[in-house]
């Protein structure tokens, strides 16, 4: 603290400025006398207390840690942009039934695992409930009823499903777009046949998993 209040001249500084050098004791006595003369109302005890105090740092600068910049989320393409770019279109050279048979085999294994093996004693209602919420891409689907006679009998592997249509590749390598509205479809796997009423099935595949389907006695097209 003493060094913060006063500092003794070096021999060279004293000689350069023509200042008489003081010993440490004389310098300390000078400071005490100066304080007593400058602040006469302060007692000797308070002066000693002030001399013993630590220096107060008026300003203290800390290095601020650089804030991490938020990562920019990659913005994907919108549904309209994907349609405009025709990303969902199946190229003519890829419209071959044999090309998607492995997909059908994968789908059958997926449904067997989903229904715990499709055993003969399995309740049909349970299989129906599972199929309604399952991913149908790769299933062999048939149109059994329709208000448009030309759709009846169309059978093939389901390649794409949207909210309103099924896209099916037939054994003749024809890509058919079948509307769900006013059509009844069947899906068969391991001798189990499930009926799908398209008019009540107008949902995206991702939305069906959370949809609660209610059993009804009869449904018209």
From Swiss-Prot:
Subcellular location, record wording: Nucleus, Nucleolus
Keywords of the record: Nucleus, Phosphoprotein, tRNA processing
Biological processes per GO annotation: tRNA 5'-leader removal
Matches recorded under SUPFAM superfamilies: Rof/RNase P subunit-like
Classification via InterPro entries: RNase_P/MRP_Rpp29-subunit (IPR016848), RNase_P/MRP_Rpp29_sf (IPR036980), Rof/RNase_P-like (IPR023534), Rpp29/RNP1 (IPR002730)
Modified sites of kind Phosphoserine: 10
Primary location class: nucleus
Gene3D superfamilies named in the record: Ribonuclease P/MRP, subunit p29 (2.30.30.210)
CC terms in the record's Gene Ontology section: multimeric ribonuclease P complex; nucleolus; nucleoplasm; ribonuclease MRP complex
GO molecular function: ribonuclease P activity; ribonuclease P RNA binding
Pfam families registered for this protein in UniProt: RNase_P-MRP_p29 (PF01868)
Function as written in the Swiss-Prot or TrEMBL entry: Component of ribonuclease P, a ribonucleoprotein complex that generates mature tRNA molecules by cleaving their 5'-ends.
Sequence similarity: Belongs to the eukaryotic/archaeal RNase P protein component 1 family.
Subunit structure: Component of nuclear RNase P and RNase MRP ribonucleoproteins. RNase P consists of a catalytic RNA moiety and 10 different protein chains; POP1, POP4, POP5, POP7, RPP14, RPP21, RPP25, RPP30, RPP38 and RPP40. Within the RNase P complex, POP1, POP7 and RPP25 form the 'finger' subcomplex, POP5, RPP14, RPP40 and homodimeric RPP30 form the 'palm' subcomplex, and RPP21, POP4 and RPP38 form the 'wrist' subcomplex. All subunits of the RNase P complex interact with the catalytic RNA. Several subunits of RNase P are also part of the RNase MRP complex.
Name listed for the protein in its UniProt record: Ribonuclease P protein subunit p29
Record organism: Mus musculus
